[in-house]
A protein has these predicted regions:
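Short, basic (Lys/Arg/His-rich) helix/loop patches that form interaction surfaces
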Residues: 44-46, 144-174
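Basic, Lys/Arg- and aromatic-enriched nucleic-acid-binding interface segment
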Residues: 10-66, 70
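Conserved tyrosine-mediated DNA breakage-rejoining catalytic core shared by Y-recombinases
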Residues: 16, 71-108
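Active-site/catalytic core of tyrosine-dependent DNA strand-transfer enzymes
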Residues: 35, 98-157
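Non-catalytic DNA-binding core/recognition domains of DNA-processing enzymes
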Residues: 1-3, 97
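Proline-centered turn/helix-capping motifs that create local helix->coil transitions or kinks
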Residues: 3-11, 110-116
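Short, contiguous acidic/charged loop-to-helix segments that flank catalytic cores in large enzymes
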Residues: 43-45, 83-96, 130-139, 157-161
Length: 174
């Protein structure tokens, strides 16, 4: 406005090279040794064991996002392959289920009701619209709380969320 009104001179590229975004100071990926300790910890608490199983599966499924993991349906696993569409983008995905993942997959999915379309016990599958979204956000918050509990039990002091699993997988691939 000041330039348009003649109160200030126009200076081309005045802010060239100036970063105007928000810089993230916190690393989202976990170091491999801490990730390994979360994946291999001996746990008595059944809820933390399920959280660890989900963490391991999400990592083995190529750093799968929690939203995709929670929305997997029983029909998405066929012939040793996990086939689904990303929730965020609709991109079709094919992931071979490794032999190391089957036991965790069976155990985690054993808590799902027979009438539920979902592979894992995070969502019930009976809500629609805003209620379905509320159910998902509640499941995500619950999972993240359990990840933090798991980290505390394992002596991991770095902040962790479901996104940390995805980011850790990507960083290890680099």
């Amino acid at each position: 406005m000041a330039v348009e009104e003649g109160l200030a001179p126009y200076i081309p590229y005045l802010f060239k090279g100036v970063f105007t975004g928000i810089e993230s100071k916190r690393k989202k990926a976990l170091p491999q040794d801490l990730l390994r300790s979360l994946m291999t910890a001996s746990l008595d608490d059944p809820e933390l064991r399920k959280t660890r199983q989900a963490l391991c599966l999400m990592f083995q499924f190529c750093g799968m996002a929690f939203v995709d993991f929670a929305h997997l349906k029983k029909e998405n696993v066929r012939g040793g392959v996990l086939e689904y569409k990303r929730q965020k983008t609709g991109t079709p995905m094919l992931i071979e289920v490794q032999s190391t993942a089957w036991e965790s997959l069976r155990e985690l999915s054993s808590d799902v009701g027979k009438d539920s379309p979902y592979l894992f016990p995070f969502l019930k599958g009976i809500k629609v619209g805003k209620e379905a979204y509320k159910e998902y956000t509640s499941a995500l918050a619950h999972f993240n709380r359990n990840l933090k509990r798991l980290a505390r039990v394992c002596g991991v002091s770095i902040p962790i969320t479901s996104y940390s699993i995805r980011h850790s997988f990507a960083m290890i691939l680099k």
